[in-house]
């Protein structure tokens, strides 16, 4: 696919050394949309005046004035065009009577061309001007079935007679060429200078045309003052990126949840969740949408059977509506969900030829189920929608009731904003409000995830961005020099990262990179380095396997492995600082600084603009065994593995391995910290042995196997996405916490509450968790357990919140308020568990955590799960704990209380003393 447009351009321009354009005719600028159209002739103002495209099995060449088709000076190009359009050698060439002089040009070159009133069989090439209104359907089907169409005309005069607001939809030529993504506009084309391009010219970011989408927005939102999208589903955000696409519903941050587009002769309306297409409260909008999609026609509205609740909404307002298992040709409008791409091609042709498509869906669930896969490329809805200039993002949007966007809000458009941004970077008259700048940053990063290979419109925008960013350079951003998230610098950071991830050579973007963290004496190894990684992953989650290598900023590494490994679902990851800082107000680094690549071939070049440690990601359940991986272009990083790395080897690494980040590893935990911190660590063995002791305790309490199926990870970063630390894989912490996790003496004397708290989060399980009450409570059981059983630090000393006076104060305060469940959280909630532990020990917890791993069909609500815990714990300790939990305000169900009534009363219930005191 990558060479289709390039090869076509080469064929069209073969032997063309100049554009000998007649001076008299005034051309119209052409507007290109979709994924097939590309420019052929562009003037020095960047206006497209000749374009080519394809539709179905056929091809089109569109010329911006019919006079060009009769000009002998353009004969070399016209002959190339006819040759490229010809479906097979010797196919007939027909010329409409309106272009009779073209026959002579073609015949003089030895081509058999004849004047014909319309194209016929067998399929060949047909040449016509853009003013014929009687052959529209014939010409579309001619191209769709494999014919080649050469068409020329200008629309500015037609616009002067019929109005500029009708050009795109009603100008005769556009009724044909628009199916292939090419439109004649009412804008004059400049005739001063034309350059013969050596490669496919760039498509303009923003083209002026008379038709105003504000009229469409007004029609779609008529009679509506607010859009209440609280329909039970969590919507995705939408990306509006096509020249003829526009937003309809926006939240205060310009995040889009309803959008629409013109495409070809048809129209599309997109909702960010399918629930929006069935909710009665959305009825007025849905009626407007279907009527707008129908374009005044009275045809049938088809509703896919998966969206059957929409039918009554439409039928009760007099719309002819039927349930349909599939799209069929006799429909005027079709309504469906965005979760299957089986009919993608048919839907795209349906819209292109005049149909209306109402479609809805979210992409966040697909993204969660397909880690490592890009929703912009692989989500079925986007396979349908991308060509329309609309996409569904994996990012969610908080449902609410939003006022209809103001005209100013509705005027935001990714392409227009990018055009303004370009002007600003070029020190021209550009202006973007901060809200638009912040939105551009997010939209740009998302747009760059759409696969550009073989799509001229996307390739063109990538080229434009490369030029913009090379000209502006990358800003120096650091903790000492942060940038605001709504600044031009932040937008540059996000766009550069997205561009690099899309395949752009990082070295082009990284020149003069202001965030170099490496020693200037570091250079990639000229010799390949082979490391053996463990390809066995018995766990339920993907596992990062360290290579001990680092890729420098802006560099490429060549990774090679065996054919067996290339078919095993492995990925290469550059960088471990996986927190996405897109929502942060200030940035001390780029928002995204890691990148993953599938190793689905034996050799692959990988890169990341910001550099990073290299990992191989082994998918869950992998039984691959030892895998040799050869990497060229990386540098060794400090890496110490407990039980494998000798002290001498570590000392040598500290002298020779100068990469900015290194790792300390056991089979159960891996710590990623700056090399500067590691240089002070004379011998990593004692601290790692302590970590392994603590990890064994973590596993013991959780009733999980030890060694861990997948080592936990703690990664330090200059900035993280939430809190002082946060859980996950990896656990993230600030640089200030590094000393806390690698200094054995401090850990033994002062404790290490925060990291164990986060490890506790990673052990929490849905069955015995009651969010939001216990989210920040039960994780602390691990902190208490590790401090007491491994570090020998009593709970009262391990954290100030667990001193006896503090604990007593909290209990009294909670009971004094009537023990409201809404206040039972964090330390108050932990107290409940500590009282149980102090009475019955740790064993019931360990036993229950093990038992819960075997349970299925657990209650889905908090009340059900809390009652199950009461029942299970009571049975485990053979005491009726109902009064104890009731004292804490738990919602005990009668059947649970009755089932435990035969158990002995818990005489030592620690809550009794407080309850008696209150009486």
Swiss-Prot record:
Isoform 2 is expressed in the prostate and in cancerous prostate samples. The keyword Membrane applies. GO terms for cellular component: cell junction; plasma membrane. GO terms for molecular function: transmembrane transporter binding. Keywords: Cell membrane, Membrane, Transport. It holds the Pfam family M60-like_N. Belongs to the TCAF family. This is TRPM8 channel-associated factor 2. The gene is TCAF2.
């Amino acid at each position: 696919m990558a060479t289709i447009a390039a090869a076509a351009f080469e064929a069209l321009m073969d032997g063309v050394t100049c554009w000998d354009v007649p001076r008299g005719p005034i051309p119209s600028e052409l507007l290109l949309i979709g994924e097939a159209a590309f420019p052929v002739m562009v003037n020095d103002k960047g206006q497209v005046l000749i374009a080519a495209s394809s539709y179905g099995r056929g091809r089109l060449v569109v010329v911006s004035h019919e006079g060009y088709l009769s000009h002998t000076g353009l004969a070399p190009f016209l002959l190339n065009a006819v040759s490229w359009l010809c479906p097979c050698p010797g196919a007939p060439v027909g010329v409409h009577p309106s272009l009779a002089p073209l026959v002579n040009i073609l015949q003089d070159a030895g081509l058999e061309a004849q004047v014909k009133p319309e194209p016929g069989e067998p399929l060949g090439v047909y040449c016509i001007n853009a003013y014929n209104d009687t052959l529209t359907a014939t010409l579309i089907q001619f191209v769709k079935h494999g014919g080649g169409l050469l068409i020329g005309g200008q629309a500015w005069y037609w616009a002067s007679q019929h109005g500029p607001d009708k050009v795109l939809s009603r100008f005769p030529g556009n009724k044909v060429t628009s199916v292939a993504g090419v439109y004649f506009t009412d804008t004059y084309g400049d005739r001063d200078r034309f350059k013969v391009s050596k490669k496919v010219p760039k498509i303009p970011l923003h083209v002026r045309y008379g038709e105003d989408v504000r009229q469409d927005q007004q029609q779609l939102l008529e009679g509506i003052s607010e859009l209440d999208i609280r329909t039970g589903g969590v919507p995705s955000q939408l990306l509006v990126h096509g020249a003829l696409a526009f937003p309809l519903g926006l939240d205060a941050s310009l995040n889009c949840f309803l959008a629409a587009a013109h495409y070809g002769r048809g129209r599309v309306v997109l909702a960010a969740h399918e629930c929006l297409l069935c909710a009665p409260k959305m009825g007025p909008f849905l009626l407007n949408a279907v009527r707008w999609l129908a374009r005044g026609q009275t045809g049938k509205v088809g509703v896919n059977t998966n969206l059957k609740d929409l039918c009554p909404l439409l039928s009760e307002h007099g719309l002819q509506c039927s349930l349909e298992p599939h799209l069929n040709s006799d429909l005027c409008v079709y309504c469906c969900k965005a979760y299957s791409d089986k009919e993608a091609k048919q839907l795209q042709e349906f819209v292109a030829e005049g149909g209306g498509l109402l479609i809805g869906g979210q992409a966040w669930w697909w993204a969660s189920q397909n880690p490592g896969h890009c929703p912009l490329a692989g989500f079925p809805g986007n396979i349908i929608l991308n060509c329309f200039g609309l996409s569904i993002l994996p990012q969610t949007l908080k449902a609410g009731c939003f006022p209809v966007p103001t005209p100013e809000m509705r005027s935001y458009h990714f392409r227009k904003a990018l055009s303004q941004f370009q002007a600003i970077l070029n020190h021209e008259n550009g202006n973007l409000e901060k809200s638009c700048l912040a939105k551009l940053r997010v939209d740009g990063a998302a747009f760059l995830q759409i696969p550009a290979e073989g799509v001229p419109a996307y390739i063109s925008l990538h080229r434009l961005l490369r030029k913009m960013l090379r000209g502006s350079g990358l800003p120096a951003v650091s903790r000492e020099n942060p940038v605001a998230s709504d600044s031009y610098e932040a937008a540059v950071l996000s766009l550069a990262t997205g561009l690099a991830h899309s395949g752009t050579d990082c070295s082009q973007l990284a020149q003069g990179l202001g965030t170099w963290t490496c020693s200037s004496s570091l250079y990639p190894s000229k010799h390949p380095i082979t490391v053996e990684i463990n390809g066995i992953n018995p766990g339920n989650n993907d596992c990062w396997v360290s290579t001990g290598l680092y890729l420098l900023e802006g560099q490429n590494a060549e990774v090679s492995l065996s054919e067996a490994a290339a078919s095993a679902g492995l990925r290469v990851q550059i960088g471990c600082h996986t927190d996405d800082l897109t929502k942060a107000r200030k940035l001390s680094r780029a928002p995204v600084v890691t990148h993953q690549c599938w190793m689905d071939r034996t050799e692959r070049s990988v890169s990341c603009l910001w550099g990073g440690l290299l990992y191989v990601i082994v998918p869950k359940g992998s039984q691959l065994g030892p895998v040799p991986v050869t990497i060229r272009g990386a540098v060794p990083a400090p890496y110490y593995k407990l039980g494998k790395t000798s002290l001498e080897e570590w000392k040598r690494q500290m002298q020779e391995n100068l990469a900015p980040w290194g790792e300390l590893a056991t089979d159960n935990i891996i710590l990623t910290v700056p090399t500067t911190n590691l240089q002070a660590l004379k011998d990593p063995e004692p601290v790692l042995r302590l970590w392994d002791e603590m990890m064994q305790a973590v596993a013991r309490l959780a009733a999980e196997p030890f060694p861990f199926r997948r080592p936990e990870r703690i990664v330090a970063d200059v900035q993280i996405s939430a809190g002082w630390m946060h859980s996950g894989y990896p656990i993230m912490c600030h640089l200030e916490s590094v000393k806390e996790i690698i200094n054995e003496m401090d850990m033994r004397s002062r404790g290490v509450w925060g990291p164990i708290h986060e490890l506790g989060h990673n052990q929490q399980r849905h069955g015995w968790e009651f969010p939001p009450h216990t989210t920040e409570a039960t994780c602390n059981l691990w902190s208490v357990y590790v401090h007491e059983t491994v570090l020998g630090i009593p709970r009262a000393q391990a954290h100030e919140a667990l001193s006896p006076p503090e604990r007593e104060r909290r209990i009294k305060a909670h009971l004094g308020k009537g023990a409201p469940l809404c206040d039972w959280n964090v330390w108050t909630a932990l107290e409940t568990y500590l009282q149980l532990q102090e009475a019955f020990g740790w064993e019931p917890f360990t036993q229950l955590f093990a038992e819960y791993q075997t349970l299925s069909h657990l209650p889905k609500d908090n009340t059900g799960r809390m009652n199950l815990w009461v029942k299970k714990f009571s049975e485990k300790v053979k005491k009726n704990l109902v009064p104890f939990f009731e004292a804490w305000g738990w919602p005990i169900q009668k059947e649970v209380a009755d089932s435990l009534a035969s158990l002995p009363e818990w005489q030592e219930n620690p809550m009794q003393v407080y309850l008696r005191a209150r009486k």
